[in-house]
From Swiss-Prot:
Keyword 4Fe-4S: no
Name the UniProt record assigns to this protein: Keratin-associated protein 22-1
Organism of origin: Homo sapiens (Human)
PANTHER family named among the record's database cross-references: KERATIN-ASSOCIATED PROTEIN 20-2, KERATIN-ASSOCIATED PROTEIN 22-1
Assembly description: Interacts with hair keratins.
Function: In the hair cortex, hair keratin intermediate filaments are embedded in an interfilamentous matrix, consisting of hair keratin-associated proteins (KRTAP), which are essential for the formation of a rigid and resistant hair shaft through their extensive disulfide bond cross-linking with abundant cysteine residues of hair keratins. The matrix proteins include the high-sulfur and high-glycine-tyrosine keratins.
Key words of the record: Keratin, Repeat
InterPro entries in the cross-refs: KRTAP_matrix, KRTAP_type8/19/20/21/22
């Protein structure tokens, strides 16, 4: 989970911000992140 969180964190910062990495890391639903700005980013990041 740590790898996914970090990987998506980099993408999230560039696209949406903290909300991206936080939502993806905590919930772990990938495309269903709390941050709507990184919707496509989260999907391609594969942070399930």
């Amino acid at each position: 989970m740590s790898f996914d969180n970090n990987y998506h964190g980099g993408q999230g910062y560039a696209k949406g911000g903290l909300g991206c990495s936080y939502g993806c890391g905590l919930s772990g639903y990938g495309y269903a992140c709390y941050c709507p700005w990184c919707y496509e980013r989260s999907w391609f990041s594969g942070c399930f």
